[in-house]
Amino acid sequence: MFRTGKAIPIAPAKEDEALLNAAYDAVAEALAQGELVAIFPEGRITDTGELYPFRQGVKRIVERTPVPVIPLALKGLWGSFFSRRGGPAMSNPFHMRPFSKIALEAGEAFAPQAATPDVLQATVLRMRGDWK
């Protein structure tokens, strides 16, 4: 799944600074080639269904490769196979609620200099509404 999606491995600098730098290089290369790059700016999967604070990754990416940033809000993942509700994420194939509805909402693009972690998080929270 990750290979098909062209996932770029990443780790916090405190765990593996070389891998983090390689990830930023791979993102810059993908963007320069016109690829779309999706990131999860929280840096981890939520244990509660609520958003964690957005980290500085998007800011660092657009400082190096200034591109528009499109905020995306995932809705309905909490309680699904991909959430940590009831245990580790992606560990139980029967974890997904029957007929659960998952949605993705895209917002308006931000100019690179306007795409700060605080602005993006506020936008995603507004887009997500009461969904988890």
Where do the protein language model's features map onto the residues?
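A cross-family acyltransferase "interaction/gating" segment
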Residues: D47-A115
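Short, cationic low-complexity segments
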Residues: A122-K132
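Short, amphipathic alpha-helical "lid/cap" segments that border enzyme active or binding sites
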Residues: Y24, A28, A103-L104, P117-V124
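Catalytic-site beta-strand/loop segments enriched in glycine and acidic/polar residues
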Residues: A28-K59
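Membrane-interfacial amphipathic helices and adjacent loop/beta segments
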Residues: M1-A32
